[in-house]
Structures are given as structure tokens and as C-alpha cells.
Curated annotation (Swiss-Prot):
Family of the protein in this entry: Belongs to the orbivirus NS3 family.
Domain of life: Viruses
Protein encoded by which gene: Segment-10
Cited function: Plays a role in the inhibition of host innate immune response. Interacts with host OPTN and thus inhibits the recruitment of TBK1 to the host Golgi apparatus. In turn, downstream partner IRF3 cannot be activated and IFN-beta production is impaired. Facilitates viral particle release either by increasing plasma membrane permeability through a viroporin-like activity or by viral budding.
A matching Pfam family: Orbi_NS3
Transmembrane segments: 119-139, 162-182
Name of the featured protein: Non-structural protein P8
Subunit structure: Forms homooligomers via coiled-coil motif. Interacts with host OPTN; this interaction inhibits innate immune response.
Membrane-related topology note: Multi-pass membrane protein
Gene Ontology terms: cellular component: host cell Golgi apparatus; host cell plasma membrane; membrane
Compartment(s) where it occurs, according to its Swiss-Prot or TrEMBL record: Host cell membrane; Host Golgi apparatus
Record key words, sorted: Host cell membrane, Host Golgi apparatus, Host membrane, Host-virus interaction, Inhibition of host innate immune response by virus, Membrane, Transmembrane, Transmembrane helix, Viral immunoevasion
Biological-process GO terms, alphabetical: symbiont-mediated suppression of host innate immune response
């Protein structure tokens, strides 16, 4: 009887140990917190173009308002570079092709305006000389100025004094022509400056698009970061 109890105890002990091993081999859901595997980030980094564009605009606006045409052209170039960094790649290429088509026309218009300004400026100088001569002649006739030639006094002849009304009309016409030419030249200067600014902007935009990746290293023009090796 004692041996039977010992044998039964051994069987129950073996059965208990086997159940314990099976219980430990099971994975409980609440005990094991599963996490997804970690992968290296493969998505492109956020574009840094807006930041670069803001820095360029800050550079353009940091100085005082350009008092000279050179300073204004510099600010226009900065603005074009900032625009190139801000635009999308497709829009950038479209603008570059449009600029290449418009630039020859702008340069042609600029040359024509410069020639027109040169003609108007020459007309202004001629009108100024005519106005000065007629003013001197009219003033001399009115004051009856006498000239000394070889020790003898010579007065202005009477027939020359009769030309005073005509000289006065010529003087008024020359003065009016001077005013018109000066106003036209001022308007042409504004148009020329505006076209020069547009040419500078479009050329700067195209230069920014054509820049190579090596010139910007980690900040290329294609809109995303490049890893530095």
C-alpha cells in the first residue's frame, strides 16, 4: 500500500511538472507587448527651399531702399533667386523657357528706347542752344548794345532789331521744345529702368535654375535635401 501511494505521488508530480512546462511555453498576449520593427526612414526630407527663399528675401530687404539703379537691380536679382527657390520644379522649368523667349524681345525694346532717348536728348541740346542764342540776340537788341570794331563804335543795325519779334517766337518755341523733350526723356528713362529691371530679374531667375548641385551642396534646386558624402 505504501509503494502504491509513492507511485501515485510520483505520477502526480510528473503530471504537474509537465503542465507547468506547457504553461511556461505559451506566450500570453497581455504579457508580451509586440512592437513593429524599426526601419530606417526612407521618405524624402522636408524641403528647405522655403527657408532659403526667406533668407534671400531677408537679405534683399535688410538694406535700405535702393537709391541707385545698381542697388535696385541687386534687390531685383535677390527677389528672382528667392522666387526660383520657392517655385516648384515644373513651374521653374516653364518660367525658364518663357524667360528665354521673352529676353530677346525685351533687349530689342531696350535698344530701341535707348536710340529714341539719344535722339530726344540731342534735340533737347539743339533746342537749348537755339533758345540761348535767341535770348542773347533779343536782349542785345533791346538794350541797344554797341560793339567796338577797330576803335570805332558799331551799333546793332536797325534791320536786325526788326527781327526781335521773330526771334522771340523762336525762343518761345525752342523753350517749349526743351520742356517737351525733357519730359519725354524722363519718361523714357523710367521705361528703360523698368525694362532693365525685368531683364535682370529674368536673367537672375534663369541663372538660379541653371545652377549645379555642387554649388549648393546640401541645398539643391530640385526641392529636397541631398545626403552629403
Amino acid at each position: 500500500m505504501l509503494s502504491g501511494l509513492i507511485q501515485r505521488f510520483e505520477e502526480e508530480k510528473m503530471k504537474h511538472n509537465q503542465e507547468r512546462v506547457e504553461e511556461l511555453s505559451l506566450v500570453r498576449v497581455d504579457d508580451a507587448i509586440s512592437q513593429p520593427p524599426r526601419y530606417a526612414p526612407s521618405a524624402p526630407m522636408p524641403s528647405s527651399m522655403p527657408t532659403v527663399a526667406l533668407e534671400i528675401l531677408d537679405k534683399a530687404m535688410s538694406n535700405t531702399t535702393g537709391a541707385t539703379q545698381t542697388q535696385k537691380a541687386e534687390k531685383a536679382a535677390f527677389a528672382s533667386y528667392a522666387e526660383a527657390f520657392r517655385d516648384d520644379v515644373r513651374l521653374r522649368q516653364i518660367k525658364r523657357h518663357v524667360n528665354e523667349q521673352i529676353l530677346p524681345k525685351l533687349k530689342s525694346d531696350l535698344g530701341g528706347l535707348k536710340k529714341k532717348r539719344a535722339i530726344i536728348h540731342m534735340t533737347l541740346l539743339i533746342a537749348a542752344v537755339v533758345a540761348l542764342l535767341t535770348s542773347v540776340c533779343t536782349l542785345s537788341s533791346d538794350m541797344s548794345v554797341a560793339f567796338k570794331l577797330n576803335g570805332t563804335s558799331a551799333e546793332i543795325p536797325q534791320w536786325f532789331k526788326s527781327l526781335n519779334p521773330m526771334l522771340g517766337v523762336v525762343n518761345v518755341g525752342a523753350t517749349f521744345l526743351m520742356m517737351v523733350c525733357a519730359k519725354s526723356e524722363r519718361s523714357l528713362n523710367q521705361q528703360i529702368d523698368m525694362i532693365k529691371k525685368e531683364v535682370m530679374k529674368k536673367q537672375s531667375y534663369n541663372d538660379a535654375v541653371r545652377m549645379s548641385f555642387t554649388e549648393f551642396s546640401s541645398v539643391p534646386l530640385d526641392g529636397f535635401e541631398l545626403p552629403l558624402t
